[in-house]
């Protein structure tokens, strides 16, 4: 099962845990805030005790994490692979920042031009 970056952002914090199965080197370049670093073997062999929380797993491109998510689903967990992996999450975050920055620029322009509060 897969989940998109947009769907992940819509989940409530307490209902899931995000696991980063990339290498330490990859993680040093960036990671999803709040994610737990682990290895694929560790996650598969010692899954979380709390079966009520969704498990979101990501790797660099979403290729390796989907296999782990499938195997955890077979064990009765609600596990998802982040579609497109960390790179897709980064693209989503960058797009949202650009949209937010654009909105701020438009708002500033309107305030300046019309001298009104929005």
Residue ranges of predicted features:
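Short, surface-exposed ligand- or partner-binding patches at beta-edge/loop junctions that are enriched
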Residues: 58-59
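Rhodanese-like catalytic fold shared by cysteine-dependent sulfurtransferases
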Residues: 1-17, 24-54, 63-118
